[in-house]
Amino acid sequence: MGKYNLILSEYLSFVYNSQSAVQIPIYYSSNSELEKRCIDFHAKCVDNSKKGLSLSSLFEEYKDVIDNATLLSILSYSYDKYNAVERKLINYAKGKPLEADLTANELDYENNKITSELFKSAEEYTDSLMDPAILTSISSNLNAVMFWLERHSNDVGDANKVYRRRLDLFIIVASTINKYGVPRHNEKYRYEYEVMKDKPYYLVTWANSAIEMLMSVFSHEDYLIAKELIILSYSNRSTLAKLVSSPMSILVALIDINGTFITNEELELEFSDKYVKAIVPDQTFNELQEMIDNMKKAGLVDIPRMIQEWLVDCSLEKFTLMSKIYSWSFHVGFRKQKMIDAALDQLKTEYTEDVDNEMYNEYTMLIRDEIVKMLEVPVKHDDHLLRDSELAGLLSMSSASNGESRQLKFGRKTIFSTKKNMHVMDDIAHGRYTPGVIPPVNVDRPIPLGRRDVPGRRTRIIFILPYEYNSAQHAVVEKMLSYAKHTREYAEFYSQSNQLLSYGDVTRFLSSNSMVLYTDVSQWDSSQHNTQPFRKGIIMGLDMLANMTNDPKVVQTLNLYKQTQINLMDSYVQIPDGNVIKKIQYGAVASGEKQTKAANSIANLALIKTVLSRIANKYSFITKIIRVDGDDNYAVLQFNTDVTKQMVQEVSNDVRYIYSRMNAKVKALVSTVGIEIAKRYIAGGKIFFRAGINLLNNEKRGQSTQWDQAAILYSNYIVNKLRGFDTDREFILTKIIQMTSVAITGSLRLFPSERVLTTNSTFKVFDSEDFIIEYGTTDDEVYIQRAFMSLSSQKSGIADEIASSQTFKNYVSKLSDQLLVSKNAIVSKGIAVTEKAKLNSYAPVYLEKRRAQISALLTMLQKPVSFKSNKITINDILRDIKPFFVTTEAKLPIQYRKFMPTLPDNVQYVIQCIGSRTYQIEDSGSKSSISKLISKYSVYKPSIEELYKVISLREQEIQLYLVSLGVPPVDAGTYVGSRIYSQDKYKILESYVYNLLSINYGCYQLFDFNSPDLEKLIRIPFKGKIPAVTFILHLYAKLEIINYAIKNKSWISLFCNYPKSEMIKLWKKMWNITALRSPYTSANFFQD
């Protein structure tokens, strides 16, 4: 077994190093003889440890177990309640503790003062500004670092340099923490006033960030960057990340393009050897110099020096260092402000009368026209989604907060909850549900607020609107998004594209006679000036649309939507400030509506069009592309002469002047070679992503457990690694060890082994090899997977009670009755299951399920139940296939150039050999005809799991299913009798398998699975017509080859002679695959 188990046993002897500590390994085997020996071994170990005898004689006696069985878990027993962290920390606390500069930040509470100075008493105290919001403690983090340092203290050569760099940085952290003592966390991993009062307020979150940074140090440059950020972030809790990352927006404009990739007509990336010179006016250098000076003023030395040294020749080779600095800057942690400051931020901008009303007018009209263009077709055709918008809204109702806690009665049970879905049920039950009335959000009913914290930016507020707003906007927004899906201007929504496609779009039109204008409009989106023109544009669009239809239901839908806009033009918010709740008139647009993303994109598109139309009065150019992506927009302009410094300068000044005429405080830049937006940046013709995901601090607390968070931690580590920020893998594994251990009693803990955490089961947390998803096919792996499946679904008494109440049942049947033309058990059950699943976000239900899961897990980790599950998983399919494959060595030349310099070597190598992919593989079934047929007549959206179930039913049943959803019997009959139906069977199976194999996640999303270079390595003689079997054989072969290449940086070729007799068996099995949901899959989903 791999490295994990080795680290696990070393870690246990590191943490529990007293005389009394015992570690008992627990083994299991699928071989019944060996399994008996495993049980004996365990019994004797426990027996010996009770008597205080050594276990080493048993290890000899049961050598067969240790050699041939699989480690299941380690039981660790230790009574000294250890203040071991403090004891070990003293050895590292050799340096001078950091002293915070208490004037570093504008807002008093952002200075790292002693907690009792910021909060006079426990009543006043809040941890919300420094809460790491992660289910692991500062003491565990310190332990993990000290464990690593101890393990590597004897390293030699380059490894020793890494050790010395990290040791040096850890001495800073250790000395500072040791001065005040290690803060102890409570059982919810929070730090209370009593613990913090004599310590600096930001000590914990700073130390977590510092540890995350120092464990990501490898080179000398890393060391310099980390040291500077660790020391300065101790004092500067507000602007450090912004200062350090600001220069990037200019740096991307300084590198000549010498060869790049462009998007061709087929939407594929294709190499182009064009050369484009970076044309940079002096003013740009002055602005950059100013940024560097600001960095120096803030006390930075090495980072600005590195940037200045790079500026000498602006080479692409050394740009990776700039890229590194940009990524590192985010790891100083989140900037968490008080809500009152976050809200007032938008309201501080003075309102001036001196604006260009003509431009505002044009802006509003563009928004109006875009709204009309988006909705014209569905409105004129009286689209069923717009007619049944209320039902669609209910089906998609989220289980997020509705802004207030209410007392609700479900049967005999009375509960308090803030969840939207529960409020809706309650309102319907008591006749309070009035979808035709959108409650006002004025001074009488101010909006409660949520928050969004991001490193390097101010805290933003989020409206928590009543559920009526969600209901009213849902259907219309869906239609807006489906329009955006096939409109290239909307980079974020454009059909199945990914970031690589957007990259090729930009580079495609760059040349000596074009320039690219890129603007960050995040300030504008939340500014007061935007509110009136924005909402009015939408209202005018809706008015025009209402005249295009005679269907009262569609008109009603549009009117409700319009009402949400009218209400929000007069919005008040409630902000807790100390003990009082302030009501403030809030005249700006905030996130929180269903339309936020779509409407912002529309507004940003209108904004850049307005600006371009002004520029066009002065210059003659062709707009080659306009794109909007979230808070950013960019456009490539082609002139009829070569671009000069003078031109870049003038266009830049004109653009900024035009924005200022609208009072838009935005960052507008003009370049000839690259852009930088929030999601990605293009420099020297290559694409880069910011690797800025924090590992040891989280933005907010959700209801995920330690296991979930361990999986999220691993997933974040992988994303950062793909983007060029590499954290020590041993450290990540140590964190996983800590976060997945299960306490049995105070002194007894159970630590799962690698097999448990990496097997594709409901408990999977990480992959034993980065970037490679393995599906275990050995006897022991399948055995443990089956064992886990026996305890996968946990019941919750509270959820059952709610679900059996009249309130709940009535709600579900109301939905079913509105949705279905005739009875349909699959859909009715589906709705009930979905609604019941929404109850999971209600804490008591969640906790109850978790407790059951953990007690089952505890039983399982001490002895796996031999269990014959009749469920088939993807592992079983792959296990059936595997024996028929023969492997031979093969050669594949490197033939593509690099376009994403930050990728790890092995992933880069695979892309260079087989090519990359610019599209998402469809894994939801939405491209199948049955899915399109259903969405033509119904607002119901079946999941890929449901489609997979339905499509394998008998034809008669499929027909009934369709008819019950409102598909005319004629259409349903035609569908089942046509060839389309058998194509669908294959399409849906394909999507389902892709979905199970997470083909759009991790690094698999970068590889071209249909690469001819890859196909060349696979030989499968064609037998009979079972496309599904051919598909799975090919896909398995591709994954095997790619996984091998990632691991070994070399290629294999696969030959498969699959017997015809087995094909039918396999095909039958393929219609019974069970999907497994695990912390690992939800972490992947969470990345989305």
Curated annotation (Swiss-Prot):
Give one GO term, molecular function aspect: nucleotide binding
Q: Where in the cell is it found?
A: Virion
InterPro entries per record:
DNA/RNA_pol_sf, RNA-dir_pol_4-hel_dom, RNA-dir_pol_luteovirus, RNA-dir_pol_reovirus, Rotavirus_VP1_C
Q: Which reaction does it catalyse?
A: RNA(n) + a ribonucleoside 5'-triphosphate = RNA(n+1) + diphosphate
Species lineage: Viruses, Riboviria, Orthornavirae, Duplornaviricota, Resentoviricetes
* Segments forming domain RdRp catalytic: 501-687
BP GO annotations:
DNA-templated transcription; viral genome replication
User: What name does this protein carry?
Assistant: RNA-directed RNA polymerase
Q: Which GO terms describe its cellular component?
A: virion component
What class does this enzyme belong to in the EC scheme?
transferase
Q: What does this protein do?
A: RNA-directed RNA polymerase that is involved in both transcription and genome replication. Together with VP3 capping enzyme, forms an enzyme complex positioned near the channels situated at each of the five-fold vertices of the core. Following infection, the outermost layer of the virus is lost, leaving a double-layered particle (DLP) made up of the core and VP6 shell. VP1 then catalyzes the transcription of fully conservative plus-strand genomic RNAs that are extruded through the DLP's channels into the cytoplasm where they function as mRNAs for translation of viral proteins.
